[in-house]
């Protein structure tokens, strides 16, 4: 029976991969030269035809601060002995794989931001949904900010400029108004056209509710306690995924080796190679 299930999985995965079209890797483009940064950045901040459909806005910084404090405190609660169990650990690793590997790395980053490959629309939306469950914002904002970062990496208009220090590039930038969000309507114009992506961008936080309800029910059914699975599957998992993702923006721009000039401070970091979901350009 186990062999049969494995065979069915392999056939299904094989059929999906046949529909994937890998694009020829684009040549590495260096960030905009320093003397042109301000001029080009200002152009991106000007209102575009997509601004009415997706009005640019700045972060509600206090909301971000309170959310981060709450999620980190809850992750500490999850580590209390009474919440440890194999089902809880399994929930963490499963949702880590679903959100960090499939959602952020494969979906938000490789597929939507860089268009490294092409998949059927339903599969693209599945990956985007997994990314939204990571609670790193919806696909429109994530992709727009990432494309902005690649255009102006480690310059004064880069929202997580590593030259401002490890803390700033790791998470400090989120607690200030992010001017780069004004450029999102232009940089994510291809995603704004899709109403499903606009939905994910607006309601990504709410996706945690059905997940929490399912985890609670499973925990109660297994007899390990519903809150154990909820705490490990949501707040603790979010904190783990957050910091591993952020280390790509901070640690790989501060420590490591640069075998060639990329035009910014990005480096190859061996530690991140084994801790991040997969090798990613930063």
Predicted regions, residues:
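Transit-peptide-like, low-complexity N-terminal presequences
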Residues: 18-51
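Intramembrane catalytic core of multi-pass membrane enzymes that act on lipidic substrates
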Residues: 113-114, 126-188
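Conserved small/polar residues in nucleotide/adenosyl-binding loops
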Residues: 274-281
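Hydrophobic transmembrane alpha-helical segments that form the core helix bundle
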Residues: 60, 65-81, 85-103, 161-273
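Membrane-interface helix-loop junction between the first two transmembrane segments
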Residues: 85, 103-119
